[in-house]
Amino acid sequence: MLSNIKNLSLTKKLVYKIVFFIFCLIPFFSGLDSIPPLDRDESRFVQSTYQMIETNDYINIKFLDEIRAKKPIGIYWAQSIFANIFGEDKISSYRYVSTLGALITILVLWKFSQILFGQKASLFVVSASMISLLFIFESHVAKTDTLLLSFITFQQYLLLKIILNKKKSILFDLIIPISMWLALGVGFLIKGPISLVVFIFTLSSYVLWSKDINLLKNIRPFWGIICFMIIVFPWVFIIQKLSLIHISEPTR
């Protein structure tokens, strides 16, 4: 009897989660193919990715005849994957990256806020994000911001898991820290050092506030930095080799 009640409760929770996820899809997928370009930068990102696909050159980013490599290459690679799958002539193909970023952000934020505030409060937090006009707008624009936000949110969630962990296991000792550094590296490839700045600020603020020096060891900085460099360094090296940009040039 108790087992049946427990199974029914788990089934209801699963149904709630599925319904909630479907509810998330409605504002983010509406109008992706019918809304015209909303931003000057969106047109530039789309055109640059389109040229990347047409020329089959996935390193040398260009907007028309102008070299466009002041921002890292991650967003162009992500957009090109969706454009190759769904069609390079459809504006929605390039926007799916931002939509996916928005969905990942919502799902990670849901888990994040469950840990911090509990089940009921987490629904309020996520619902507030979902009805934000700015958030919905950004999920419809083929730019970097929403995808970057998803990796920053995921990285912060993993850092929280490391902070709260009190037991020894390969999951918390290696897999979660390495995953956090990988998310940090991908975030860097999307929009430069912004994800790194957020990570350093959060980490240093928590350590200064809590006096928990062990956290600096628990994030596995040695292996983490190696993983970070494996992701970031090849692009930096290639760009320097091709003399496309100077790393010190400010991002537009």
Regions inferred by a protein language model and the residue ranges of each:
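Membrane-integral, polyisoprenol-dependent glycosyltransferases
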Residues: 2-248, 252
